[in-house]
């Protein structure tokens, strides 16, 4: 069970005093962790709780949200607190009244995502590892995108598959693909763009008509990987892609690389 005494103390330290008698209310949105709404003196707070082993995941999420919010081009939930107590961990975020997406919001999201992707770094990766869902994501920095993607994305997924019994033809095909990776980048050298990292349709919504993104798996990489994720499960309309393309046109060969990244 969450240590609500410790959570309330952490919220108070962050300027969100919990009134006497206030109790957390279970809410949706915690597919991996338990999710709660708690009223405080500064407004409602969204909380995720889990075992102490969840702390690294929660703290990486908090740092990811702060990184995405730093350029001030796209809205993300504000981070209030993150910590552990005993055998439990938590992260507290700004409560946002999320609603349905609209075509106009999709277009603005496309423009804003392109602006976010213009925030770049000198190397691919990030200063720490994180998770995509429950799957570990390794982000050791590299100045070589092909090498980074081969080792920390494609290669890592193949090793996970092998550990789960998927061997034989899948591994052989994966090995051939890894050898062919440079072909996809013969005339394309991506910048190390700030990425959401897990931008599927369930990780964005609207608040007061404005697009909001959340539940990131942040790192610096090829911006086309974020777009490939948006196409994997749907949830993004033509207005989104048209607006992105208008703000920052994609390079030749992006359709082939989209298949690679998916």
Cite the ranges covered by each PLM segment.
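ATP-binding pocket architecture of kinase catalytic cores
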Residues: 25-147
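A structural signal for short, hydrophobic beta-strand segments that form beta-sheets
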Residues: 20-21, 78-79, 252
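Small/polar glycine-rich anion-binding or flexible loop at a beta-alpha turn
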Residues: 257-262
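Short beta-strand or tight-loop elements
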Residues: 20, 75, 181, 195, ...
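Active-site Asp-x-Gly
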Residues: 138-150, 155, 159, 188-194, ...
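Conserved N-terminal boundary motif of the eukaryotic protein kinase catalytic domain
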Residues: 17-25
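Short, surface-exposed alpha-helical segments at coil->helix boundaries
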Residues: 4-5, 62, 238
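An alpha-helical support segment within catalytic cores of ATP-dependent transferases
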Residues: 2-14, 120-195, 246
């Amino acid at each position: 069970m969450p240590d609500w005494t410790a959570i309330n103390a952490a919220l108070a330290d962050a300027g969100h005093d919990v009134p006497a008698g206030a109790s957390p209310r279970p809410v949706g949105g915690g597919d991996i962790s338990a999710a709660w709404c708690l009223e405080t003196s500064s407004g409602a707070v969204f909380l995720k709780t889990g075992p102490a082993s969840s702390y690294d995941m929660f703290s990486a999420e908090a740092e990811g949200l702060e990184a995405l919010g730093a350029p001030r081009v796209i809205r993300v939930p504000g981070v209030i607190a993150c910590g552990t107590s005993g055998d439990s961990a938590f992260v507290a975020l700004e409560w946002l009244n999320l609603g349905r997406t609209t075509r106009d919001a999709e277009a603005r999201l496309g423009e804003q995502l392109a602006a976010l992707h213009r925030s770049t770094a000198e190397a691919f990766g990030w200063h720490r590892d994180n998770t995509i869902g429950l799957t570990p994501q390794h982000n050791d920095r590299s100045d070589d995108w092909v090498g980074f993607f081969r080792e920390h994305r494609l290669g890592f997924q193949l090793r996970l598959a092998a550990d789960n019994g998927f061997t034989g033809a899948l591994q052989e095909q994966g090995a051939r693909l890894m050898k062919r990776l440079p072909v996809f980048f013969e005339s394309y050298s991506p910048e190390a763009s700030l990425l959401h990292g897990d931008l599927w349709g369930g990780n964005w919504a609207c608040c007061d008509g404005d697009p909001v993104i959340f539940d990131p798996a942040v790192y610096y990489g090829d911006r086309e990987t974020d777009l490939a994720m948006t196409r994997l499960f749907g949830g993004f309309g033509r207005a989104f892609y048209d607006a992105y393309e208008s703000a920052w046109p994609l390079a030749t060969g992006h359709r082939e690389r989209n298949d690679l990244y998916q």
